[in-house]
Amino acid sequence: MPAPYRPDPVDYLLSADAIRQVKARYCRYIDTKQWDRLGSLFTPDCRFEGLGSAPPGADVATFVAGVSSRLGPTISVHHCHTLEIEMTGADTARVIWAMEDFVEFTDGSTVKETPGSKGFRGYGHYEEEYRRENGRWRIAFLRLTRLRLDPVPVDAPAPRMGQRQASTDWLESN
């Protein structure tokens, strides 16, 4: 059995930070409905599993089309935290993110994952592979696993939007 890859400590820290940035953008782009930017976070050959918005093995275009169609009429909040990261090579890594999401449909739809509800709060993990190409880290494989789903009842109070909505180009404007 080959010895595990041992990255340079500085490259490890820089790579881990870059990977965290990619995942933060993933959550923000989904929640602020920036579908045109979402696809840029993935390698062209990325594959997806465990998602209600794309079939297993879907490619990037199918995933973006599915998630934009499915989550377009929602208020969604995605949080990823407490990552575990293992560098598997100079330009590859495996990561597990603890995750929590809240999805509420605003168009009267009910949800197949939690029948008879207008949304859900979910808990689980993302299992992902990342690859650095041309100096840029991107997601090469994404799997969502679920530990728990709690329904948002149809008769739950109507959502109230925050006082100030997100600036979709806050970072990009500098």
Q: Where would I find each of the regions flagged by the language model?
A:
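A solvent-exposed, acidic/Ser-Thr-rich amphipathic alpha-helical stretch
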Residues: W35-T106
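Generic alpha-helical secondary structure signal
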Residues: I30-K33, G52, V67, Y130, ...
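A beta-strand edge to alpha-helix "cap/lid" segment located at domain peripheries
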Residues: P2-P7, G72-H79, E86-N174
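Short, low-complexity N-terminal intrinsically disordered segments enriched in polar/charged residues
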Residues: M1-R28, T32, D36, S40, ...
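Sparse, context-dependent recognition of short Cys/His-centered cofactor- or disulfide-binding micro-motifs
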Residues: P4, L14, K23, D31-K33, ...
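Solvent-exposed, flexible loop/coil residues
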Residues: D17, G52, P151-P153
